[in-house]
């Protein structure tokens, strides 16, 4: 993502200061917290940023190869995580409101759309064969998690992801209005607005929108490079670069798992203030959910191994878990590589061995909730 932001900054004719500023703002942000999690979000943000990059290149060159590149980027992003579709839905009205609405009358635009459909068709066919499970999943997500999302908290969280680069984003939004070279890119802030409105309406999790901001950091850095390029203002350039570094310090403390669980629990008020203790159930817990989910994986696998070792007929034994996280942890850390833990959650439901009869079942339950009594092993 950082490299893509660098390339966008170059495409916007930003100088060395703009390149360093945009890269610094991306690097020293909560964005890299996503890389600590075994989730598709890192690639998701990269695809969002790359999609904007291909659009910017197409605006500047009108070369149809960038439409094909856009199609490929969207397809990769879609196959990784469906949320990139929200970005495209936000882009459509944004483009229609600018002079680029002419794209919708071009043959190459629709050829690229067909190319996209071909690339994602295996997934669409699979969804069709399984009665479009994505909609069932979204409904389950809405009922169990998104119903607990506070829309005001969603908007407040947007300010925290790039706290050190927030001033850069503000300058970017201002530049789209007053800076003539950016006039042709006004569909970008409009797409940000429309996509955010979509997420607010559907009560999306706040991090879903994080991919909207890297491109804005590039625009803001280029505009600041222009503003600070003469007279005494050039001396403000080092200050602008230092700001993201300084403001990253409190973000590092809160957003990254650099402290042991006991110390995080001891600073409950601080983490609660920034909503870090709020879980998907809408309640505050002792630890941030992403960090809590990582704890005890090895211990869990060892406990299951102790039980599994006592089973004589392992071939006809089923280890079934409450969710894919538990199943994945057991399969990864267990000393029994054939243990094959499964779950009715996510893709694991398709990995059950239905060839052999089951005589023994080991059930692994989720005991995260504080109202569940700890009954030992």
Residue ranges, per PLM feature:
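Membrane-interface transmembrane helices that cradle and orient dolichyl/undecaprenyl
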Residues: 11-16, 51-67, 173-181
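Signature aromatic-anchored transmembrane alpha helix within multi-pass, membrane-resident enzymes
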Residues: 227-268
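Short helix- or helix-capping micro-motifs
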Residues: 21-29, 74, 78, 92
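Short acidic/glycine- and proline-prone juxtamembrane loop motifs at membrane-interface regions
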Residues: 30, 36-44
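Transmembrane-lumen/periplasm boundary regions of multi-pass, lipid-linked membrane glycan transferases
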Residues: 76, 85-185, 196-199, 203, ...
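Hydrophobic/aromatic-rich transmembrane helices and adjacent perimembrane loops
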Residues: 187, 197-232, 236-237
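Specific aromatic-rich, kink-prone transmembrane helix
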Residues: 2, 43-60, 66, 72-74, ...
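Transmembrane-helix signature of polytopic, membrane-embedded enzymes
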Residues: 5-27, 45-46
């Amino acid at each position: 993502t950082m490299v893509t932001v660098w390339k966008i900054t170059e495409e916007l004719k930003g100088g060395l200061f703009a390149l360093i500023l945009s890269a610094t703002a991306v690097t020293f942000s909560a964005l890299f917290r996503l890389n600590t999690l075994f989730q598709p979000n890192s690639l998701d943000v990269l695809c969002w940023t790359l999609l904007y990059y291909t659009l910017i290149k197409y605006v500047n060159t009108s070369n149809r190869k960038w439409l094909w590149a856009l199609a490929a980027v969207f397809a990769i992003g879609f196959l990784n995580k469906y949320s990139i579709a929200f970005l495209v839905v936000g882009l459509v009205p944004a483009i229609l409101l600018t002079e680029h609405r002419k794209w919708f009358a071009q043959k190459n635009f629709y050829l690229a759309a067909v190319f996209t459909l071909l690339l994602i068709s295996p997934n669409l066919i699979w969804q069709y064969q399984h009665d479009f499970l994505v909609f069932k999943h979204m409904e389950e997500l809405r009922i169990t998690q998104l119903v607990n999302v506070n829309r005001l908290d969603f908007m407040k969280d947007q300010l925290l992801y790039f706290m050190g680069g927030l001033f850069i984003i503000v300058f970017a939004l201002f530049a789209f209005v007053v800076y003539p070279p950016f006039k042709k890119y006004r569909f970008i802030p409009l797409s940000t607005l429309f996509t955010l409105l979509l997420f607010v309406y559907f009560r999306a999790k706040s991090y879903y929108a994080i991919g909207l901001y890297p491109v804005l950091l590039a625009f803001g850095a280029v505009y600041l490079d222009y503003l600070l390029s003469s007279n005494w203002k050039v001396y403000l350039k080092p200050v602008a670069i230092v700001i993201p570094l300084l403001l990253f310090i409190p973000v590092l403390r809160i957003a990254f798992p650099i402290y042991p669980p006991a110390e995080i629990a001891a600073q409950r008020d601080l983490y609660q203030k920034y909503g870090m203790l709020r879980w998907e159930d809408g309640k505050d817990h002792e630890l941030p959910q992403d960090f809590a989910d990582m704890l005890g994986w090895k211990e869990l696998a060892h406990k299951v191994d102790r039980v599994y070792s006592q089973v004589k007929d392992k071939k006809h034994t089923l280890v079934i878990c409450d969710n894919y996280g538990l199943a994945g942890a057991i399969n990864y850390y267990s000393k029994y590589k054939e243990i094959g833990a499964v779950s009715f959650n996510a893709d694991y439901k398709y990995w059950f061995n239905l060839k052999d009869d089951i005589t023994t079942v080991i059930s692994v339950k989720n005991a995260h909730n504080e109202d569940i009594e700890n009954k030992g092993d």
